[in-house]
Amino acid sequence: MVVNIYDTANELSRQLRETQEYQGLQKAFEALKADGDTFDTFKKFQQAQADAQHKQMTGQQPTDDEIKNIQNLAKEVSGKKVVQDLMNQERQVDSMLQQLNKTITSPIQDLYSEVMPKMPGQE
């Protein structure tokens, strides 16, 4: 039997959209977009973070003003309920994805199980 793993991945992608976790995230994101001022600030925060990360990846350091701007934007958006709700939904999706990743990669973990270091208390 020939298995096309990419067909399976595409089906998993489709099913992901049907999960409670994804639908909750989608609803939270729509609520954020509906709050125009908060959404604009959120986009500025995301862009400022991306710019700083890009600088770091190219060997540059963000300026003190850029860091202060990111901190101020983070403080402003993190206090908003719609952003807190979005972050809670992101955590739920992340938890689900971690479990999926654990399941998907279990054959690799099994393959290397003989050489994986044991943590204290494991048998």
Curated annotation (Swiss-Prot):
The lineage of its organism: Bacteria, Bacillati, Bacillota, Bacilli, Lactobacillales. This is UPF0342 protein Lreu_1268. Belongs to the UPF0342 family. Pfam families: Com_YlbF (PF06133). HAMAP family: UPF0342.
